[in-house]
Amino acid sequence: MKSLILIAALLAGTYVWFNNGNHLSAPSGTEQQSFAGPSSFGQADSNRQVQSEGVVVKVLPDDNHGSRHQKFLLELSSGQTILIAHNIDLASRISPITEGDVVAFNGEYEWNEKGGVVHWTHRDPNGRHEAGWLKAGGRIYQ
């Protein structure tokens, strides 16, 4: 009898763990492109949730003004360079991250003349914005 209760408790705990998003996997049910995604983004994509991947070409210093952000530049397969601004007050930082690393991303794209920025690469604690994420080294950061 005690073993049945223990098994039921373990199953319930596992269910709660996975349904509260505490696991390290990509969100399910998203209608996004594959990690390869589009090879470039433009002004028409501004303010949209996008998903793709690129190679880290420069690791930048953290932005510690207001909400803290880990920042780095990714080069997409098209040659376009985009800035990733990953909120490390709401999500774990990618560590270590170095030039040449491949990083997949899901976040909100904002166009600018330099190629654009992707932010919202984390969950919204208030549940009002689509969750984003970064994937590097086989791990999801959100």
Show which residues each predicted segment covers.
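OB-fold and OB-like single-stranded nucleic-acid-recognition modules
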Residues: 2-142
